Each structure stands twice: as C-alpha cells, then as structure tokens.
C-alpha cells in the first residue's frame, strides 16, 4: 500500500511537471497538481502513530495539497487562499520541527550561520519584491517570515534528518522563483518553461524530502 502510494505520488508529479505545469487552468490540471502531495499526506498518516506530534506532518502536507489546488487556478482570484493554505502549513512545520529539534542544536556555530543566511535570504527576497507587492505586502511579508522560520527550525533538527533540511531549502527556493515570476515577471534565463519546471521540481522534491526525513524520526 505504502509503496503504491509513493508510486502514485512520484508518477503524478512527473505527469504534472511534464504535461501540465504550463498548461491552461482546468479542473483536471488542478486535480493532477494536488495528487502528488496529497499522496504524501496519506503516506505520512498511514505510516505514523496517528496521534500527537506525528499528526502534524500529514496535516501540513494536506494543507499544502489544498494550496496546490488554489495555485493551479487563476492567480488573481485564488492566490490569497493559496498563500493562506501554505502559510498555515509552514507554521505547522515550524511547530513540528521545533518539537523534534536536537537539544544542543542552537549552540552549534554552523547551524547558527545557516540560520542567519536563511534570514538574510528571506529579507533580501522581500526587499526585492517590495515595490511590486502593492496590497499583498502584508500577506507576503507574513508568508516570507513563516517560510524562513520553517527553514530555520528545520536546521535545528538532528543531523540524521538532513533530508528535511535539504527539503526545506528546496521549498524556499521554489517559492522564491515563484514569487519572482508572479510579482516581478522575472524568469530563469527569461524562460517561462524553465521557471515552471524549476518551481515544481524544487517544490515537490522538497516536500518528498521533508516527508522522508521526518518518517525516520521518532516523533
């Protein structure tokens, strides 16, 4: 069952990335986009103890899948709801990562340096976007704070959970590329296709890595 769900998740991610990432808005495209991370949520639920902190992972993944559905639609209509879904998902990740953090992690210089780099990266991105955000300034500022907190708390996990750290970084990179595209119109090498592929690959890869990494911890 779990192996089948991993296959469903990975194959639907490949199908969406290969055929629909730049496709027109449609109900089918929305469903296909939601399936990969929804399958990860089901995997996390079925393989976890189904109580306490372990339920935070499937909850964050399920909210992310809902966010995927909103962002598959018309951004002018659904972007605020998509941002809200992912904002709550990030806050759940923050709570989960913090609760599972290594006791001495905060005192390790390398982690401190990485966290400072994450904060500076978030501030730099927000500064660059600021003039283009208009009425979305408050919402985007809250979102950037949440995803930086998600990456920072992920960096406090035991080193054995390194896939979570890589996944959180990939997630933030995906959001940075998406934000540059949505608000500034900036694309990788001027290519909408390259940007679309990068956004999806980093996002799905990040979520899969977070799922794998947390499944290896005793939550």
Regions found by a protein language model. Give the residues of each.
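Polytopic alpha-helical membrane-helix bundles and their juxtamembrane interface segments
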Residues: 1-219
